[in-house]
Amino acid sequence: MKKIITISALLLTAFAPQAMAQEQTQPTQQTARPAFDNELLPWETPRDTTCHEVLLETTMGNIRVALYNDTPHHRDNFLKLVNSGYYNGCIFQRVIKNFMIQGGDYSCRKVTPGKVEKFDVNYTVPAEIIYPKYYHKRGQLCAAREGDDENPTKASASTDFYITWGRNFSPRQMEYYVEKEKREGAKSYALPSEQLQQGYIKHGGVPHLDNGY
């Protein structure tokens, strides 16, 4: 079963469209894919589970995201925030070319004059880093967090999320990246396997975040 939830968000502007509280349930469509692509789309779950998808409606176009069932803390937290209306009127407050877009910060929400909204945001979400099954290829929905010094357990922020974009890698650029990470040694979170290297060459992404975020 596939459940689709629609919310309104903002992109690079402080004016939100009217919030929508709309939820649809549709049968899951099973589509045959090449073996390698199956591993690049790990949110495709067995028929007897529910695949939760959220449609972000922004002033720059719509973004559809899928939530992984094997990261249940993050899935449930995101759905809770969506269903509460928290993200309606939020902006993407951090946009970095060839890296990612980040939204959800409490201080960047549009507040309707005269309307009182109370949201509990003073908590963190336990880390659910499942690497190398999930990695930072282009288009991944991820939870933001504080840095390692302040946050050694890598717990995620309650509301902030980002969607990866990253850069395109040629085979030679990917080879150079791996060589550089080997030289970094302990400073590197992870070295991408040959399979993940091919994924980054094919799709692009942000490999230096792997196994750390």
Where are the model-predicted features located?
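Cyclophilin-like peptidyl-prolyl cis-trans isomerases
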Residues: A19-Y213
